[in-house]
């Protein structure tokens, strides 16, 4: 098992089973968002290896659903939907979805994956050693690994990448920082001029030099960080000079700290 965080599907499902058993008993199949969207489009329920791995349900070593995890939590195997390849026909747009969305009925649904595997796909990141990075609500560094291994301290997540197969190991190792988007929001509310937009913040930040004239901001201010062994170290601002720095330096330093 290469994922063990409490904020992923398997652990959430275990919480529902223990705390809301009446709801749990109504479950037919478990789905990730991509599975649910495909179901609404086609009326069919299926999933992928990549999706199951993001939910913590995949046994990478044996290339199958993690029976040991299902047994540990007391999940029935019937909860797992039929598994389809990531790139394959996974259903077709039905009449209801076609009418509502203006799509052609019968259009094949041929791909699905989670947010970070999708981001890596869009950046042409497929092979061991290649890395994709993104900053939004959270900041993510997602690197492709060609071997089945793991971090014993659980500081990172491991997913089956979109091109992972039995014959070709391609695992996405994900490092996540919680405090990126909220840092930008905090700076807008508390540091930037009142009423400024995010685009105007970008313009203001561009007036500061690369490196923000020596200010550095570490965006660890949104709770515990798994990459730091679940420590809450808080955000820190370093190198601030009251005689030399202005709002534009701080805004740029926050953005540089995020990326």
Predicted feature descriptions by range:
Residues 73-88:
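A conserved helix-loop-beta module that forms one wall/lid of the active-site cleft
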Residues 59-61, 86-90:
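Short beta-strand to alpha-helix junction loop
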Residues 1-46, 51, 56-74, 95-259:
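Active-site core segments that coordinate phosphate-bearing ligands/cofactors
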